[in-house]
Design a protein with these regions (language model features):
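Active-site mouth loops of central-metabolism enzymes
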Residues: 2-3, 173
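Active-site region of glycoside hydrolase catalytic domains
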Residues: 14-128, 191
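Substrate-binding clefts and catalytic carboxylate motifs of secreted carbohydrate-active enzymes
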Residues: 29, 83-246
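Alpha-helical scaffold elements lining the catalytic groove of polysaccharide deacetylases
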Residues: 4-18
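Alpha-helix N-cap/helix-initiation motif
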Residues: 1-2, 167
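Alpha-helix capping and helix-loop boundary segments enriched in small/acidic/polar residues
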Residues: 3-7, 37-41, 213
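Alpha-helical scaffolding segments of alpha/beta enzyme cores, especially the outer helices
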Residues: 11-15, 44-52, 180, 221-228
């Protein structure tokens, strides 16, 4: 923000501090997401925010950005066994993998005619032929869809899957990913002491997303896979790679 008028920024900062500081659910202030708060211009903006928080709301923690020193955002979609290799990271602040959500809830927001040919959702024409489906697909990016379907193909045939088939397969594939991820991170204790999967719950109806609970409040299989890793006594299989191929 080198060219941003800092007096305007400071007025906006103060307005939002006064607006939000009495909210009991507010636990921490954060300057932003996945940007460099120390670069020219950004450092001045973060300094103004930090100074005003120290004056007007000094009881809450302030983080310049996420991730910052000691934390990491990571999306190694291919193999969750990689997480065990992050043994020097104190806190994994954001990570996860896509899956299709509950079919019954999807049918409430997407026309039946669009719930076909889902195996080709990374094709160029998919957006034109499935506008409602794509509209409710959180962070739709054709380059990432094959990774989700590749993982699901280990569970079932993804050539021309029915909605129920692709939902079950992607959720189980993602659930396996979350389980191995959590086990790997927990095994790095006491260096790694925190894991925050992205995201716990979507606030609106979605057909596919990185989430544990969909917008209708329905937990995906990923929720239960992850929850199981926090049982009092949990046994894990320590493998170098989840997938092996000749």
């Amino acid at each position: 923000t080198p060219e941003w008028p800092q007096e305007v920024w400071e007025a906006q900062v103060c307005q939002n501090i006064f607006r939000l500081r009495n909210q009991p659910s507010l636990a921490v202030w954060c300057g932003g997401n996945e940007f460099n708060p120390y670069s020219y211009g950004n450092a001045a903006s973060m300094g103004i925010l930090e100074r005003n928080l120290a004056i007007f709301d000094p009881t809450r923690c302030f983080l310049r950005t996420s991730p910052d020193a000691g934390s990491m955002h990571s999306y190694p979609d291919f193999d969750p066994a990689w997480y065990k290799g992050f043994e020097l990271i104190p806190y994994v602040a954001e990570t996860g993998v896509h899956c299709i959500t509950d079919p019954a809830n999807i049918k409430q927001v997407v026309s039946p005619g669009e719930l076909v040919d889902l195996g080709g959702m990374y094709d160029k024409n998919f957006v034109l032929e499935h506008p409602e489906f794509v509209e409710h697909f959180a962070e739709y990016n054709p380059s990432r869809v094959p990774r989700m379907l590749s993982r699901a193909s280990h569970i079932d045939n993804m050539a021309k899957p029915a909605l129920e088939t692709i939902a079950e397969a992607t959720q189980i594939g993602a659930g396996e990913f979350y389980q191995v991820m959590s086990e790997g991170v927990q095994s790095n204790y006491p260096v790694t002491t925190g894991l925050m999967p992205w995201v716990y719950k979507r606030p609106w109806p979605v057909v596919a997303a990185i989430n544990l609970v969909d917008g209708m409040g329905q937990p995906s299989a990923t929720y239960y896979f992850l929850k199981r890793t926090y049982e009092p006594t949990h046994v894990l299989l320590d493998i170098k790679r989840l997938l092996w191929a000749p």
